[in-house]
Design a protein with these regions (language model features):
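Mid-to-C-terminal secondary-structure elements
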Residues: 31-220
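Short extracytoplasmic
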Residues: 10-36
Length: 253
């Protein structure tokens, strides 16, 4: 699947299953940041991010309790909410159309959001630049739009593009760690394997490739289409045999 079609780049992204031992650790975000910093010491890696969901699966949160100051009514359309960090945009090769990315401090970004281009339009802004530094009210909390990114397909081309809003949050559960690399995946994994025990000694290392995960939905579709084609051919053959038998019967009369 091409980035031009999806709006997001899934090639050369390793997905690590997050460490469950840090679920109750209030410093889990700092621990991930330290792990990511160690990963990025290797020149093969571009960036990394921790998220609750990855491309190929739906984002868990949707919200229509959003309003714009100065406007009388709440928005009618539901907005998909994603929790990301400052590494997400570069890791998945999104375009920052206007404004800025999140910083490294979640506390400083607690009242800031990044939105997709279609979400900005729903909020009433005609261009991405117009949305920057504007305020929205999400669940009765005023937040400032600091950036606008391109629209992208979170689940696949058969699902319509969803307007999205992103907050700077580390997964409140163990989440998933996405690491973009250059070059050979085996060499990239050797580096991760060498540093994982230092940061997460009580957690096994489990990984897969983002592109493979995303394409599973299409592989299943291909399998079902193949089965349907086989049944169709079988039905045609049975019908043809029946017709041939009927013709033979009448020919003998």
């Amino acid at each position: 699947m091409q980035k031009a079609e999806l709006g997001i780049n899934l090639e050369n992204v390793i997905i690590l299953k997050g460490a469950t031992s840090t679920n109750s650790d209030p410093r889990r975000m700092e621990r991930f940041n330290a792990f990511r910093a160690d990963v990025l010491k290797n020149a093969q890696f571009v960036n990394g991010t921790a998220t609750m969901n990855i491309p190929g699966e739906p984002l868990r949160f949707r919200n229509n309790n959003i309003s714009i100051p100065g406007k009388n009514s709440e928005l009618k359309q539901t907005i998909t909410i994603g929790n990301i960090d400052e590494g997400f945009i570069e890791t998945y090769d999104l375009k920052l159309l206007a404004g800025s990315n999140f910083g490294i401090s979640r506390q400083l970004d607690s009242a800031k959001v990044i939105v997709s281009e279609s979400a900005a339009k729903i909020f009433g802004f005609s261009t991405p630049s117009e949305a920057i530094d504007q305020q929205i009210i999400l669940d009765n909390v005023t937040r400032t739009i600091i950036g606008v990114v391109n629209d992208f397909h979170q689940e696949g081309l058969k699902k319509p593009l969803e307007p999205m809003l992103f907050t700077h949050e580390h997964p409140f559960e163990f989440g998933l760690y996405s690491m973009r690399f250059k070059g050979n995946v085996d060499e990239a994994m050797k580096h991760i394997e060498s540093i994982w025990p230092k940061h997460y000694p009580n957690d096994p290392l489990d990984y897969f490739l983002c592109n493979d995960f995303f394409n599973k939905q299409y592989n299943e579709e291909k399998r079902l289409n193949k089965i349907l084609t086989m049944f169709t051919l079988f039905a045609i053959i049975v019908a043809s045999l029946g017709l041939f038998g009927m013709i033979s019967f009448f020919a003998q009369q």
